[in-house]
Curated annotation (Swiss-Prot):
A Gene Ontology term for the protein's cellular component: membrane
Cross-referenced SUPFAM superfamilies: Second domain of Mu2 adaptin subunit (ap50) of ap2 adaptor
Name listed for the protein in its UniProt record: AP-5 complex subunit mu-1
Physiological role: As part of AP-5, a probable fifth adaptor protein complex it may be involved in endosomal transport.
Keyword Cytoplasm: yes
PROSITE patterns, per the entry: MHD
Tagged with keyword Magnesium: no
Family designation: Belongs to the adaptor complexes medium subunit family.
InterPro entries recorded: AP2_Mu_C_sf, AP5M1, MHD
Amino acid sequence: MALRAVWLIRHEPGTPLGGTVRFSRRYPTVEKRAKAFNGMTYVPVPEDGPFLRALLFQLRLLDDDKDFMERRDGCSRINKTSIYGLSVGGEELWPVIAFLRDSMIYASVPLVEQALSPRPPLISISGVSQGLELLLGIQDFLYSSQKNDTDLHTKLSQLPDLLLQACPLGTLLDANLQNSLNSINSVSVTQPQKQPAWKVGAYKGKAQISISITETVKCMQYGKQDIADTWQVAGTVACKCDLEGVMPAVTISLSLPTNGSPLQDIIVHPCVTSLDSAILTSSSIDTMDDSAFSGPYKFPFTPPLESFNLCHYTSQVPVPPILGSYHMKEEGVQLKVTVNFKLHESVRNNFEVCEAHIPFYNRGPITHLEYKASFGQLEVFREKSLLVWIIGQKFPKSMEISLSGTLTFGVKGHNKQPFDHICIGNTAYIKLNFRIADYTLTGCYADQHSVQVFASGKPKISAYRKLISSDYYIWNSKAPAPVTYASLLP
């Protein structure tokens, strides 16, 4: 019960082609269904040019068509139903509904939900009656209250929008196109906004906006004079806007404190409508200076229904949040380790999680351990050759902690102890895992009072921040370490 295509063709005797296609509409989704239903008997809908020639030939409307054609003009081909089969590219397109009224040819191809050979009875094809009903509805719309060709041209220009209402995706809902026109006009008066492509529906309920800023810090510390430590901060601003209306407008401002690190390499979601040029041109490739844009960073947008990432950014912070040193060396059968951590004074001393993983690859199980920790607790996983230093939620007032110890390892078993291709010999690392709530390393925050909302109802606005470590490594300074950049030495 659907249509594959619809045409309006102006019959123009005396012209080279004999007519002009004034309007056509194809429905690709219905065409895929036709291919599946018809199987080996499927014939695709042709382009407008071949269809025009085939239809005019079948209707005997070509000026030079005077010869008798048995397959078209024979007694067995007398047509009483306005249903035709068109010869296109050596194949026959059937059924084609077509009739001529006032120099305008109305044509459509209905979907047949079965094989076309042998031809099924027309009465069993529900799309035939729908196609004919739509064509008659278009005829009534075009010539009702028509005074001249200008009126006809205006109504033809309205057909694409009307068919979206009356026959969406090829399924006829209302053959009275005047009803669709009235519906469009009433919507344009009461709701001039167009539904954005990324928004598939409308929200109904309590208005609320949630803003979450998550910064991730990566770090490589070597403890060597000839190799520079590296660190990188990347941030993501996630939003969830539950607002009523088709296109509610929201503006969120990200701000920095006086000593905050400017945001760079900003990438925004497609729903953002405009941006200050200074935001787009701020790049981490450029050398930082006092003239760098430091906000506020305003993002006007029309939110989608689901949670989305409003923007991503990077930043060049002056120092890593936790400075560390790791010394590991072998003395006979023993391994001596010394670890020191210092929390930078600018970092909030309130962790959700803070722990250091100290793996010993390519060795046997830990058989003996003597250690001294100035702070926190040490967990030993002997078979995994792993130490986990649980620092806890706060550093001490001095902001410095240390761990020293001596380890002895047993005989390495087969496929039991952890193996690593890089950590050979004394090449080793500590991996720091930490998370701080209500804090960002750049100082970036979303001011709840500066959020502008243009929608019905006053929303509840919530803002969250957190800093998370990712690939935060402290390498053994007493052994070689992998680097991906040149040494500082000439």
